[in-house]
Amino acid sequence: MKKQLLPLLLALLMRTALPVSAQSPDSTIFKDLWYKNTIIYNLEIGTFKDSDGSGTGDIEGLIQQLDYLTALGINTVWLAPFQPSPRKDDGYDVSDYYGIDTTYGTGGHFAELMYQARKRGIRIMMDIVLNHTSDQHPWFRDAAANPKSRYHDYYSWSKKRPSFWNRGMAFPGVQKETWTYNKEADAYYYHRFYDFQPDLNFMNPMVKSESKRILGYWLNQGVSGFRLDAVPFIIEKPGSDPDKPEHDLKIIPEIRRFVQWRNGEALILGEANVMPEENNNYFGQDGTGMHTMFNFYANQYLFYGLATGDIAPFIKALRDPRDIPPTSQWMFFLRNHDEIDLGRLTEKQREKVYQRFGPEKTMQLYDRGIRRRLAPMLGNRAMLEMAYSLLFSLPGTPVIRYGDEIGMGDDLSLKERLAVRTPMQWSDRKNGGFSLADTTFRPVIDTGAYAYQKVNVAAQQRDPASLLNWTINIIRLRKECPEIGLGNWEILETGTPGVLVMRYDLHDKTLITIHNFSRKAQQVKFTAPGTKYYNLLRHDMKETINGIFTVSIPEYGYSWYRMENFR
């Protein structure tokens, strides 16, 4: 009997371990894909909460605020880089992949974070920067000093300056080159980012092996997944034209297989700002690549829609990349730790977004984006609510940025992307409750409409009408609507400019969401199944007439309706 059961058990195990390539969303296997219905909260340890008065946030401070995150409704935290680093690029210049920056704490503190988060049902993801190291990393220092070093070919070198030495820069307007001369090595090294961030050469099998050791190490520490930084550059073949690079697409499924082998539930979230026709190179045709990716393409047209009220390009941007493997998922966001990248828009479209949301040069960055927080950029509570209601109702997983739940502002006096990386504002006390230090490592916003005395967690917790309490409610609502993350979806035709109506179906549930991008109230009509719908926000009923759903929606208004099923 045992011998007869063994092949069956092995077959079942293999079925659950492999990606599903053709299966409807009704399948029970999708219930195990936790990343399809989680709420992700992105933060930097250094700007979140200081526990010891050093002026810099730390792991113990984060542990102290886990109950706050639980109350907010967060079940996944994505940590920005916290490994040892010279911090010339806010930690994205790693000098030791296997450690904790002592500014933030110790390995013991990290273990306690894993334990306390797990107790509360919170998963911890981490940023992993495998594309490049710091130029202070021992690998690079040894590589530059000794051409016969085993680490020399961890990087890409050229004795002569390549003809495309000043092309393919990640930060145009700030960078001057992508090949920089190193005097000690008497050679040029390749770097897509700043010159102190030399790119690793993933065509070298030793680099791939080392990257797996790094991933395995952190999986052993208890993390539930990785936000994989700069994926298109990781798979780039050195020496190819950086404007039209060649890619080794086998690297992505190789990383996926290793991560799945070490932890079958671990997630890989890819940062790949690519065109829709390239998506399956990263997801994999059968779902063997990245589990999830940020939808940068839709994000750019979303901001165009918010700026102009013209949502036709946004609708197209939602539809174009929808054909992805069933086990894959899009991650939607409004703001992240970088600039709002508008590089895919036409120059005319980009100028319209600039005029509305970033008219001053100090608000713009890298000739392609805006370096502002959402609240001061939109400048309108109704529009802010509509934008977040939209985020939580888009067909994927929502990712929010720390502080956006209270409408934090930005500090444009800070360099480049640091404008949106200011300390969290917990109260109206000293340094916004972030730190008891006389001086914080980065200034807390203390002047203007978004000063910590006016915008902080404590004040909003006491105010039932606050943005914080509104956000708690919309997150709770999103968790009650699994059809958004798992169901089939379509965009319904209304004939009303500026109004987006989406329908979701999962099993016997139908959800309809309505969002008005317009500055004026509008009446909307569309075809809908069933006869009665319950308004999940206002808690009243709406009836269709002859299959037509008619509703009036105010400027920047939004509604969520669930079809009532009567048997």
Over which residues does each language-model region extend?
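Active-site and adjacent substrate-binding regions of carbohydrate-active enzymes
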Residues: 22-567
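Bacterial Sec-dependent N-terminal signal peptides
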Residues: 1-24
